[in-house]
Amino acid sequence: MQITAVFHRKGLRLATGVLLAMLLLAAGFFWYVSDYYRAEDAALDVLASGENIEVQGSLTILSPSYPTDTAIIFYPGAKVEGAAYLPLLDQLRRTGLTCILVEMPFYLAIFDVNAAEDVMAQFPDIQHWYIAGHSMGGVMASQFASEHPDEVDGLILLGAYLYGDYPPADTLTVYGSLNQSVEDEIDYTENVVEIQGGNHAQFGNYGPQKGDLP
């Protein structure tokens, strides 16, 4: 009985320790993801205008003023509120493209890499799909394009680089000259555009980002 009691106490202490460790990890994770970049007023104004814009769950759809069969799916950067990219997407919308912004779980595209599949299924009238993303969103968009090359017509990377084997010939890569960490990872030359004086955070309206050069 004594031996059984000893093992019982040890097992209880072990289980308690594991539970506490899990609780600490969960608390740390939720603290990490709750500290994200918020969209600035200029971005929220686009949403508030209601001009050719509609929110459907985790999707924000910006539609051109006339019918189109071409759309861009956009994955936001890590820990950035999706609405921060609305000014950029609104400009694309005005060129005649449907733009579909995906708000990611916990503001991290890594948790829903294949979100584009669900988007495509919801819009059967769209015949030509492009997938785009900023920073981590670009990396995850690149992964999706690499795994589903027959489903997308092209890939657009902002402050990001190709991840996977999607062809550079079908990819547009745009980065700022002050974003050296991205430039160092670009080992291809096709369709690469450098914005002089540009920084990592300037693709969205969410303020300065830690690590950006002045």
Q: Which residue stretches match the model-derived regions?
A:
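Short beta-strand element of the alpha/beta-hydrolase
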Residues: 69-77
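Active-site glycine-rich loops that stabilize anionic/oxyanionic intermediates
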Residues: 76-80, 177-178
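Alpha/beta-hydrolase active-site loop
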Residues: 84, 105-131
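Short beta-strand/loop motif that positions the catalytic acidic residue
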Residues: 173-175
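C-terminal catalytic-base region of ester-bond hydrolases, centering on the histidine
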Residues: 178-214
